[in-house]
């Protein structure tokens, strides 16, 4: 596809305001202004549809994970100037929940509200890990996301926070502390760029692992690392899987 055609294709995507980057601010009980910034550092590019049925639901099934694995960065700042990075000092737990949505409108420009499709399988929830590279921040990694049906989609990532310190809870309109104790609060959402899910016949194959995937794997995160490029072949050995050339690299394994 040439650049002109590619721009035409992109014009059919459903527009979203929080693609790739998103931010929000809040005020705590003690009057501190906190700003949350999320960025999709590693975008999903392609996937092979894993189909449906009992075989796809099996934990041991080859679910054809989205490639490369999406990686989302979170940074938290305190103050009006947003220069005081407090990501590593916040006394709270964070997790990110991924959902799948259509990236293109259906007939007549309408957006499908059907809940049965598209279907995202795998592990849609990730806890935050603190890494020093590529920059000191909190990261959410999704190495096990698959899509059952071919099409053009985007991932939506919703951040939830479980504050452990009462002083970090939200300030109410009356300026009083929230009536509830420790609870989980939705903070913000960021969306990925559109990506393609191919049928088995059209799937072009997997690409070499990105430098970012290798970087987080070197820091102990469980990410499949592809040693070399291996495009799809017409025939595979009986029982063979497209993930045979992958290895799970962790800091413990290399120790």
From Swiss-Prot:
A cellular component annotation (GO) from this entry: cytoplasm
This protein's record includes keyword Transcription regulation: yes
Region (Disordered): 163-184, 229-255
Location within or outside the cell: Nucleus; Cytoplasm
Pfam families per the UniProt record, alphabetical: Velvet (PF11754)
Biased composition (Acidic residues): 245-255
PROSITE patterns named among the record's database cross-references: VELVET
InterPro entries to which the protein is assigned, alphabetical: Velvet (IPR021740), Velvet_dom (IPR037525), Velvet_dom_sf (IPR038491)
Extent of motif Nuclear localization signal: 45-50
Key words of the record: Cytoplasm, Nucleus, Sporulation, Transcription, Transcription regulation
GO BP term, example: sporulation resulting in formation of a cellular spore
Top-level taxon of the source organism: Eukaryota
Free-text disruption phenotype from the record: Impairs melanin biosynthesis. Abolishes the light-stimulated formation of aerial mycelia. Results in abnormal hyphal swelling, increases sensitivity to shaking force and significantly reduces hydrophobicity.
Keyword Transferase: no
Domain Velvet: 31-226
Record text on subunit structure and interactions: Component of the heterotrimeric velvet complex composed of LAE1, MVE1 and VEL2; MVE1 acting as a bridging protein between LAE1 and VEL2.
Role, per record: Component of the velvet transcription factor complex that controls sexual/asexual developmental ratio in response to light, promoting sexual development in the darkness while stimulating asexual sporulation under illumination. The velvet complex hat acts as a global regulator for secondary metabolite gene expression. Controls the expression of the melanin gene cluster. Mediates the light-stimulated formation of aerial mycelia.
Family the entry assigns: Belongs to the velvet family. VeA subfamily.
This protein's name: Developmental and secondary metabolism regulator MVE1
Gene: MVE1
